[in-house]
Amino acid sequence: MTFARRLRDAFIATLSLTCLHGALVSAHAQEPHKAQIDALRKAMEKYKDYKVAVRDLYLSTVGCVHYSGEKIPGSMEYAKGAMGVHFVNLTIKGPPDPMKPNVLIYEPVGRDLKLVAVEWLVPLTADTKEVPSLFGQRFMGPMEGHEPLIPKEFHHYDLHAWIFKDNPLGMFAPTNPKVNCKGSFALLESPTKMVHGPHQ
């Protein structure tokens, strides 16, 4: 075997081991987030019944929010799709808790509501020094409140997690093209305006 061939084989072997190590490290890094997501999903199971959510002070904003995919300079970019009907719990405060989202999101299905996602809203304050994060995901924002359901003066960050409905745009995308907002309570929103503050 020539020296050049031995060198080539050694390089390939080293590269293979490096890639394998990287894959193992990456898989290990993702495991805690998967475990957290599984725990979150289990904790949220009871809220598949929206009446239980209401009893726990998650109150409906009624409108089924969806977006056209319109892009407006200086505003958030939302892919065409829907979020759904938001149930907001104003009693949950403080730093975002991965097991206690302060928003539950439901999709109208016939005469019922199906829990599809959860969301964390974090107010932007004078003390905010960095973008909040959960599950290795940085929150979107800061942005104004989502009018007309939330006053525009409520500047905040948010993060969605589609834990009960597959989202082709990704688990943490804000909109989901598979969610339908039809009927009397469909609410087409314009992209939310971004505001000054620590960004992604």
Which residue stretches match the model-derived regions?
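Bacterial N-terminal signal peptides that target proteins for export
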Residues: 2-14
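Primary mode marks residue(s) on the alpha4-beta5-alpha5 output face of response regulator receiver
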Residues: 30-200
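Short, flexible helical or helix-coil boundary motifs
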Residues: 11-14, 18, 51
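C-terminal segment of classical bacterial N-terminal signal peptides
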Residues: 17-26
